[in-house]
């Protein structure tokens, strides 16, 4: 197995912080983490309100609890996933098994693609509910609601970039495997090698063959 596969140097080297921070997926992942933090913080902090004559809180997005739950859920999960893959990026160069690297890159690719779609759905959902919200239901929470919608929109592109970078790393690993692959099919022009421990064919002429051949020919008849 090649240890320097899937967009990372060979295992066993020392950790280089400067080189790590310059990696594109690390930079974009940090951006995704910040965007997710802003979204669920805005919803948790000021996404709920109540009227003066009631202490019961409601979601500022058209009083639709599902809108606040959805935005909070994808924000929290995106934050946790970004932190997890950030740790994976730190230890990724220390992984010497190319198969383990492949599975981690595939997981990053699939999760990033899925969350790109979920952020798109969340942006459309929150925007639709915000447009249907009555002005009387909005007080000081308007800025937080708009911030949640805005950074949900930005998260679509940041997670899309993460998916693209993961695909590039996966493709680089596959191309390197194909390049280093050696076809085990033997050359038909070469003779088959004998098994180890089996002596070579040392055929010897049977005894008495030469004497029998030398006596062949004309022989005088027997004398009675």
Curated annotation (Swiss-Prot):
Modified residue annotations for N-acetylmethionine: 1
Phosphoserine PTM positions: 3
Chain intervals with Polar residues compositional bias: 202-217
Broad class of the protein's primary localization: membrane
Keywords for the protein's UniProt record, in alphabetical order: Acetylation, Cytoplasmic vesicle, Membrane, Phosphoprotein, Synapse, Transmembrane, Transmembrane helix
Gene Ontology biological-process annotations: regulated exocytosis; synaptic vesicle membrane organization
Membrane-topology descriptor: Multi-pass membrane protein
UniProt xrefs under PROSITE patterns: MARVEL
InterPro entries: Marvel, Synaptogyrin
Cellular location(s): Cytoplasmic vesicle membrane; Cytoplasmic vesicle, Secretory vesicle, Synaptic vesicle membrane
CC terms in the record's Gene Ontology section: neuromuscular junction; synaptic vesicle membrane
PTM remark: May be tyrosine phosphorylated by Src.
Membrane spanning stretches: 26-46, 73-93, 105-125, 147-167
Record domain MARVEL: where: 20-171
Region (Disordered): 196-224
Protein purpose: May play a role in regulated exocytosis. In neuronal cells, modulates the localization of synaptophysin/SYP into synaptic-like microvesicles and may therefore play a role in the formation and/or the maturation of this vesicles. May also play a role in GLUT4 storage and transport to the plasma membrane.
Annotated PANTHER family: SYNAPTOGYRIN, SYNAPTOGYRIN-2 LIKE PROTEIN-RELATED
Similarity field: Belongs to the synaptogyrin family.
Protein name: Synaptogyrin-2
Source organism (scientific name): Bos taurus (Bovine)
Lineage, uppermost ranks: Eukaryota, Metazoa, Chordata, Craniata, Vertebrata
